[in-house]
C-alpha cells in the first residue's frame, strides 16, 4: 500500500458524489433580494438577523448539495423555513408576550416547533391569520414542501441512501432528475422565506410601486425585483398578498403623502448611501481599535 494512501480520506469520500447545480450563481444573486429587504420595525430588533440567517441557511444548503451531502442540504432548507417562521411567530403577537417568548427562545426553553407555530399563528396571529385567509394556496405550499423535504431528511426511500445512490451499479445513472428535484425545493424555499418576510412589513412589495416609492423613501428597505417575484413568489401570490389588511393599511397610509420628484428622490438615495457607508466604516474602525487594544 502506498505511503501516501490515507484510508480515512478514501473512506470519507467512498459514498460521496458531487453534483453541479445549473446556473448556481443566479441563486446567490437572487437571494440578495431578501438580504437587502431590511425591516425598520423597532419593536422587533432581531427581525433582520433572523431573515439573514434564513438566507445563510439556503446558501449553506446549496454548498452542501454540490459537495454531495444532499440530506444535509435538505435539512438546511427546512431550517431556513423554520427560522423565517420563528421571526414571524415572534412578530405577530402582543409586545408583552413577544418579550417572554423571545427570552424562552434565547434561553433554549420550551418553544413551539414549525407546525405548532403555524397552527398558533393561524388561530391567534393577526397578520398571518389574515394572510392565510387571502393566500390559502401559499400556506398549503409551506405544508407540502416541509412534508416532502422531511422524506429526504428521514431517509424514506433508497434514493436517499448514500450507499445506494453511490453504489457501483447506480453511480453512473443520470442525476438530472435528482438535481432538478433539489432545485425545485430550493426555489420553493426561497419563495417561502420571501413571503414570510412580508409578514413583518410589506415594504419589499410596496416599494415596487413607483407611486409609493416616490412618496415613501424607506432607507432601510430595497424593493423586490419583478423578476424575483415572478420566479419565486409568483404574480398570483403577490396579487393575493395585496388583498391583506396589512398591505392595504400601509398602502393607504402612504398614498396620501406628497409625491416627490425624481431629483429629490435621487438626492435622498444618494445621501443615505453615503451616510450608511460612512457609518458602517466608522463602526468597523471603532471595533477594530477595540480589538487591537485587547489584543495588545
Residue ranges and their predicted role:
Residues 1-70, 75, 96-296:
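A cross-kingdom marker of C-terminal helix-rich interaction/assembly modules
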Residues 76, 82-98:
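Short, charge-rich amphipathic alpha-helical segments embedded
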